[in-house]
Amino acid sequence: MKVFYDSDFKLDALKEKTIAVIGYGSQGRAQSLNMKDSGLNVVVGLRKNGASWENAKADGHNVMTIEEAAEKADIIHILIPDELQAEVYDAQIKPCLKEGKTLSFSHGFNIHYGFIVPPKGVNVVLVAPKSPGKMVRRTYEEGFGVPGLICIEIDATNNAFDIVSAMAKGIGLSRAGVIQTTFKEETETDLFGEQAVLCGGVTELIKAGFETLVEAGYAPEMAYFETCHELKLIVDLIYQKGFKNMWNDVSNTAEYGGLTRRSRIVTADSKAAMKEILKEIQDGRFTKEFVLEKQVNHAHLKAMRRIEGELQIEEVGAKLRKMCGLEKEE
């Protein structure tokens, strides 16, 4: 897999072009500001007088409605939540599309699963920072960047690579390194990582460890420190140095205990469950479930959020984070 760097990309394809960033959340703000500071012509499309309207104006952007931005722009970069994209696209973006324009995304969900079907003659590309928006902006301002992905679903103009690579350069991704992938690969691996490991698997492991210690009579504060708080130390070591050097940096006791006990926690059954989760992503079952959830106004999701917020680990964590100076009183 080839990695592209700053010297491989040029901004030329975007000169004299207008990029409309649709949405001004964490990624919308970071990507639009970075491209603007790279000398590209950026406008921001938002709901008229919505919460983000004044924020984008305060950041110096040319702000307009989504329809106005889509009409004006050559490249329309959609950065609103996945579950809202198709509805906004159909009502406010699709009528403004003309041959030669480019639709761009930072997640392939709606293109890969067919919720957005672009007309003929329109490029469809993806440029995705592999980092939260605040980090995308901060590292750019520091003169570096975060790694990213690019991919091309439809190359209607025969220069889609030049366009998406210029966007990656403008956002600052090629300063760190850019990998070319596909909409299918980006979408399915991203969803799997979120569900099985990063957001689903890790949080369930932390909760199970915390509850095991508390149920055995240990102080909740001690349980939190040992199963949640210190996780960042280990993740940072892995992030910076890899598994081998993480093991080198922890104590012999931790290394031996971890290596000899870990397979009893994440078992063959765990991996089988991961494979089933991946199948649900690949065959569209998860997507259908998520669409149905939206149709009932996220009732199940709201209930799960409420339950998570009432967990003992949340109450203990809030107190300890305040004690450690990590956040103000919640």
Swiss-Prot record:
Mg(2+) 1 binds at residues 190, 194. It comes from the Archaea. SUPFAM superfamilies: 6-phosphogluconate dehydrogenase C-terminal domain-like, NAD(P)-binding Rossmann-fold domains. Mg(2+) 2 binds at residues 190, 226, 230. GO terms for molecular function: ketol-acid reductoisomerase activity; magnesium ion binding; NADP binding. It catalyses: (2R)-2,3-dihydroxy-3-methylbutanoate + NADP(+) = (2S)-2-acetolactate + NADPH + H(+); (2R,3R)-2,3-dihydroxy-3-methylpentanoate + NADP(+) = (S)-2-ethyl-2-hydroxy-3-oxobutanoate + NADPH + H(+). Keywords: Amino-acid biosynthesis, Branched-chain amino acid biosynthesis, Magnesium, Metal-binding, NADP, Oxidoreductase. NADP(+) binds at residues 24-27, 47, 52, 82-85, 133. Its cofactor is Mg(2+). PROSITE patterns: KARI_C, KARI_N. Residues 182-327 form the KARI C-terminal knotted domain. Involved in the biosynthesis of branched-chain amino acids (BCAA). Catalyzes an alkyl-migration followed by a ketol-acid reduction of (S)-2-acetolactate (S2AL) to yield (R)-2,3-dihydroxy-isovalerate. In the isomerase reaction, S2AL is rearranged via a Mg-dependent methyl migration to produce 3-hydroxy-3-methyl-2-ketobutyrate (HMKB). In the reductase reaction, this 2-ketoacid undergoes a metal-dependent reduction by NADPH to yield (R)-2,3-dihydroxy-isovalerate. This is Ketol-acid reductoisomerase (NADP(+)). It comes from Methanococcus maripaludis (strain C6 / ATCC BAA-1332).
